[in-house]
Amino acid sequence: MKVYAAPFEKFVNLADARLGTKILSVTDDWFADANRLFQPTPAVWKEGVFDDNGKWMDGWESRRKRFEGYDSAVIKLGVAGTLKGVDIDTSFFTGNFPPSASLEACFLASGEPDENTAWTEVLSSVELKGNSHHYHEISHDQAFSHLRFNIYPDGGVARLRVYGVPHRDWSKVTESEQIDLVAALNGGRSIACSDEHYGSMSNILNPGRGVNMGDGWETARRRTPGNDWVIVALGHKGEVEKVIVDTLHFKGNYPDSCSIQGAFVKGGTDSQIETQSLFWRELLPSQKLTMHAEHEFAEQVKAIGPITHIRLNVFPDGGVSRLRVLGKVSR
């Protein structure tokens, strides 16, 4: 079982490039493109690699400041959401990391921030160390769509992970509209799994198809009786009409079969939900899977009414690239 450095790491990384997060403006990224902050893969060191501006670094790096002030980057999150925590990662930045950093946020239904935008400080200035992860909890009920990441006075940061719960205005979704109820962009999140040795459980809810085998959820080889599983909270309660299980890129390591259970959960913690999931109703009976393919199940889906959570069971183990649970929202 994966050990998380901070409890909030189980939430969706709202600042993931795969969700569409990008830099809108930056005071300076002379040495390294600020958009590298959002890459889902860990930062790497490339020994002896230089470009026209100096040593190639996997992250955002500004020039040495020779005047007053500090550097900042304005960020559009791929999906707006309420913030739970942040990881400011300075991996491989040793003599060139910022001594401190802070984070501000705002919510805009449309458009981009300008000089009149009111920013809310969600993380006051914190000290940074070189080649380190810095985990800080954030507690704000408000949803935010944009961030302003400040580093004092200059330097380099490898990755910025901003964990939270995606936000969607469900009042604009009609009851006749079929949507992916578990998509990360719709607020779906993986909350527990039996194992995620090779790939994060949250990957299966990302938009698009997986880019490679690492862009999915894969368990270790099971050497004991039983099967692997992952529990997903829907972005909104709804009735399921179709399920898509995608094993793209998984060829010698795809599950032999899968099934799905569902439940309407009222209250309780994530750990309590994990225990209760053993007794959830069958939504999709066991279905055979094949390698490197999308599997659509509609006629096989049982009508069990509105649900809030699903449990994907894979037998006995293996990898799944994406999971889509299509249906209509329930009011």
UniProtKB/Swiss-Prot annotation:
<dbReference type="InterPro" id="IPR015908">
    <property type="entry name" value="Allantoicase_dom"/>
</dbReference>
<comment type="similarity">
    <text>Belongs to the allantoicase family.</text>
</comment>
<dbReference type="GO" id="GO:0000256">
    <property type="term" value="P:allantoin catabolic process"/>
</dbReference>
<dbReference type="GO" id="GO:0006144">
    <property type="term" value="P:purine nucleobase metabolic process"/>
</dbReference>
<keyword id="KW-0659">Purine metabolism</keyword>
<dbReference type="GO" id="GO:0004037">
    <property type="term" value="F:allantoicase activity"/>
</dbReference>
<keyword id="KW-0378">Hydrolase</keyword>
<dbReference type="InterPro" id="IPR008979">
    <property type="entry name" value="Galactose-bd-like_sf"/>
</dbReference>
<dbReference type="InterPro" id="IPR005164">
    <property type="entry name" value="Allantoicase"/>
</dbReference>
<protein>
    <recommendedName>
        <fullName>Probable allantoicase</fullName>
        <ecNumber>3.5.3.4</ecNumber>
    </recommendedName>
</protein>
<comment type="pathway">
    <text>Nitrogen metabolism; (S)-allantoin degradation; (S)-ureidoglycolate from allantoate (aminidohydrolase route): step 1/1.</text>
</comment>
<dbReference type="Pfam" id="PF03561">
    <property type="entry name" value="Allantoicase"/>
</dbReference>
